[in-house]
């Protein structure tokens, strides 16, 4: 597998060059064999999709609680339409008491808005506004369950973060922080702090979103050659500012400077590690103003000591504040700042205005463009489509994990097979949830009915929909949903259709989403927990062999399905598991002689 697979949340193993094989020579599989196992218990929490509006009934103003310092311009906007309570530095207990009297809450990163906050509001809290981008401190599942819309302010601090990244890069290259400390200590060591020039150097921007784009613009102005890696960045946007989009491996191998601007997700956690540092040009310099967790900090210390990384400039850390005795922070070739990316007066005012406008709009029942959890659809439609909504998201999530890291998804086709006429089947929510499933595993964007099409367009993802009208009763809204991703490289060759597209199909059985087809192979496995897909030679004992390996590792199997072309030919085994197998366990499965390839998928 290529190194770009490090950016993927799944683990894939394939033998030889199976990854590029299509299944065009195989005939469609007519049947599937299924074996069911008892589950240890699954999370059955039902989520409501909401779009809020706030009305006090008696014409009085709503109450907005501002729990952390907000710019004056934002406070004034709030005071024009609401009663504003600015209470800073509250304890969790104080917040829980006060929240029952409030319709909206505005926080920054220092206030944890957990389930207990929503429970304490007794249903009155309608909007939570996060003054900034990250929403790690807000329990989105609880917010949605309690009918509370969460909005953020993702654009106002873009320039500030980009400027700080450039400032750190220049300060690092010229040893500004170290030289400053030396002079203040009474020294005058000019030769010790000779730096390097930026002009003519290659900067790799990892994550070409809003901040990454602005960093690239400024680096170009400094005379740097800029390349970028982001599987979902539109090539035309990059080319418009003179930036070449390259693979993850190429970015690592050719860069003199690397600037990180990716979100922290399960797929990007510790994406810079011992393995990826080893692929970098010796003497590379690294800047991080994104999220601390995208770098394995211990591995970075080792890379610095080994001379692979010449210098690093960091504004963010895995744990903030970092430990006083942190080897990374104390390293003589590391420049650090205390998470100042958005800390300019202009950015603070901009964030205040942006979040105030979003909260006021949401309280007025408007569709919030910066909403990060789902809006409401009619109760009737939601009740009927609820299991299909879950199916849609999981099919999208499964399909994107079958794509080899770095190839990027640009085209997705959704096929709905139904006995209902087009006018009787509203697929907007299903389309949004498939978009959510495709984008969220590799992004920090929270996709919902409000922002799905906008987010897809922004990331260069084109979605087309097709209806297949079936004969029969239209009592059930859908028979199957099929998701196909074209022009991509697959990490699991068997997921390719006869036309070379990653293809997955599913349906709802007794209210539970099922995976029913992978590529041209028919299977039948519930879309819960995690799934292992194996392509194997169909022979006796395979179910027992794989099951024994999982059992020895205390991995509980809840469902197993085998689909085959014909007896003793190729087959696909789909195994549903309640637990995440270790790498060693997965390796043992891959070493079974009859297993030709396999992939582990987290749903």
Curated annotation (Swiss-Prot):
Residues binding NAD(+), per UniProt: 210-211, 230, 289-291, 315, 339-342
InterPro entries documented for this protein: ACT-like_dom_sf, ACT_dom, Ado_hCys_hydrolase_NAD-bd, ASB_dom_sf, D-isomer_2_OHA_DH_cat_dom, D-isomer_DH_CS, D-isomer_DH_CS1, D-isomer_DH_NAD-bd
Xref: PROSITE patterns: ACT, D_2_HYDROXYACID_DH_1, D_2_HYDROXYACID_DH_2, D_2_HYDROXYACID_DH_3
Alphabetized UniProt keyword annotations: Chloroplast, NAD, Oxidoreductase, Plastid, Transit peptide
Main location: plastid
GO biological process: embryo development ending in seed dormancy; L-serine biosynthetic process; megagametogenesis; pollen development; sulfur amino acid metabolic process
The organelle targeting sequence, given as a residue range: 1-54
GO cellular component, one term: plasma membrane
Any one GO molecular function term: NAD binding
Protein's recorded name: D-3-phosphoglycerate dehydrogenase 1, chloroplastic
Gene that this sequence comes from: PGDH1
């Amino acid at each position: 597998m290529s190194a770009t697979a490090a950016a993927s949340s799944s683990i894939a193993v394939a033998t030889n060059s199976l990854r590029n094989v299509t299944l065009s020579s195989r005939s469609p599989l007519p049947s599937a064999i299924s074996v069911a196992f008892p589950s240890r218990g699954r999370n059955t929490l039902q989520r409501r999709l909401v779009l809020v509006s706030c009305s006090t009934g008696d014409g009085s103003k709503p109450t907005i609680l501002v729990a952390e310092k907000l710019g004056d311009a934002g406070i004034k906007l709030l005071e024009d339409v609401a009663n504003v309570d600015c209470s800073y530095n509250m304890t969790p207990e104080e917040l829980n008491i006060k929240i029952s009297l409030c319709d909206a809450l505005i926080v920054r990163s220092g206030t944890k808005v957990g389930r207990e906050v929503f429970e304490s509001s007794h249903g009155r809290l309608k909007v939570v506004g996060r003054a900034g981008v990250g929403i790690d401190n807000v329990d989105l599942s609880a917010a949605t369950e309690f009918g509370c819309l969460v909005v953020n302010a993702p654009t106002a601090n873009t320039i500030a973060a980009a400027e700080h990244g450039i400032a750190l890069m220049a300060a690092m290259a010229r040893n500004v922080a170290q030289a400053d400390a030396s002079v203040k200590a009474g020294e005058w060591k000019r030769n010790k702090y000779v730096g390097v020039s930026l002009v003519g150097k290659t900067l790799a921007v990892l994550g070409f979103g809003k901040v990454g784009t602005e960093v690239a613009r400024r680096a170009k102005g400094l005379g740097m050659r800029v390349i970028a890696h982001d599987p979902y960045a539109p090539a035309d946007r990059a080319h418009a500012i003179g930036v070449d989009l390259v693979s993850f491996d190429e970015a690592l191998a050719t860069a003199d400077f690397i600037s990180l601007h990716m979100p922290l997700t399960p797929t990007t956690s510790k994406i810079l590690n011992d393995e990826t540092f080893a692929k970098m040009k010796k003497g590379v310099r690294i800047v991080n103003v994104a999220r601390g967790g995208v770098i394995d900090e211990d591995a970075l210390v080792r890379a610095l000591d080994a001379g692979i990384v010449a210098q690093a400039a960091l504004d963010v850390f895995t744990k903030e504040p970092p430990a006083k005795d942190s080897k990374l922070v104390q390293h003589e070739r590391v420049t650090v700042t205390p998470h100042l990316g958005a800390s300019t007066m202009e950015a603070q005012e901009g964030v205040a205005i942006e979040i105030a406008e979003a909260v006021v709009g949401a309280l007025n029942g408007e569709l919030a463009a910066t909403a990060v959890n789902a809006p409401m659809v009619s109760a009737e439609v939601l009740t009927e489509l609820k299991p299909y909504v879950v199916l849609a998201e999981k099919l999208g999530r499964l399909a994107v994990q079958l794509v080899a890291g770095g190839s990027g998804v640009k085209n997705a086709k959704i096929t709905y097979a139904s006995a209902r006429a087009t006018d009787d089947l509203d697929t907007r929510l299903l389309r949004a949830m498939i978009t959510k499933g495709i984008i969220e595993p590799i992004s920090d964007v929270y996709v919902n009915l409000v922002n799905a099409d906008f987010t897809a367009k922004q990331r260069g993802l084109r979605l087309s929909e097709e209806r297949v009208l079936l004969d029969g009763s239209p009592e059930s809204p859908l028979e199957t949903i099929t998701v196909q991703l074209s022009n991509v490289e697959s990490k699991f060759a068997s997921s390719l259709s006869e036309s070379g597209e990653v293809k997955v199909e599913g349906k709802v059985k007794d209210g539970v989403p099922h995976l029913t087809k992978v590529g041209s192979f028919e299977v039948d496995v519930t879309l819960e927990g995690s799934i292992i897909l194996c392509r194997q030679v169909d022979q006796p004992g395979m179910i027992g062999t794989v099951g024994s390996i999982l059992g020895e590792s205390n991995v509980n199997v809840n469902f197993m399905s085998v689909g085959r072309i014909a007896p003793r030919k190729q087959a696909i085994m789909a195994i549903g598991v309640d637990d995440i197998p270790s790498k060693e366990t997965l390796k043992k499965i891959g070493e079974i002689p009859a297993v030709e390839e396999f992939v582990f998928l987290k749903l």
